[in-house]
Amino acid sequence: MNVKDLDFTIDLNEAQAWAKEVLQVKTSLFRWLYDPVPYIDSSLIFQPVLYNLQYNITKEDFREACGRYIDRNPKNYARTNFAFGWGEVILNTFSDACNAILSVLPPKGQVIEHIDGKPIAKENLHMIHIPIFSNDKAFSYVNGEKVF
């Protein structure tokens, strides 16, 4: 299967409505992480405004929240292209998947190259990372090679 052949289109209005519904129901599951960084406007540090929320999406519950994130610019929240609607599509595409974690990076966000935790190898699980680009300036590195 070629990931490029998969159709992960989503209606952003529906995704944001879905996210707002989940935020209202599941707010008790969120833990806000305030991490002052020099380039952050200090007036924003203690505002619990979300830019990046990971959802642990399983076949049993497509709305189980996890993770802790902050917003470095509240204006970004409304513009963020939430990927929540892709969860069911991904799980239905990979029939053996037990869960999917979807994460949206803020503008100029960066994921540091890493190897996922050791327990995963022991459980005979294989993690598949699918980068979803929301604009033509986004890119990723695969095996040290820049891809768009």
Regions found by a protein language model. Give the residues of each.
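A short beta-strand-loop-beta hairpin characteristic of the jelly-roll/cupin
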Residues: I112, P131-F148
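Generic structural motif
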Residues: D11-A15, L105-K108, F133-N135
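Conserved short histidine dyad/triad with adjacent acidic residue
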Residues: I101-K122
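Short, conserved beta-strand element in jelly-roll/cupin
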Residues: V104, K122-A138
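Short, conserved, surface-exposed binding loops centered on an aromatic residue
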Residues: I90-S95, P119-K122, P131-I132
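Long, contiguous binding/interaction regions
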Residues: D61, A100, D136
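A generic structural signal for short beta-strands and their flanking turns/coil linkers
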Residues: D96-C98, H126
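Non-heme Fe(II)/2-oxoglutarate
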Residues: M1-T93
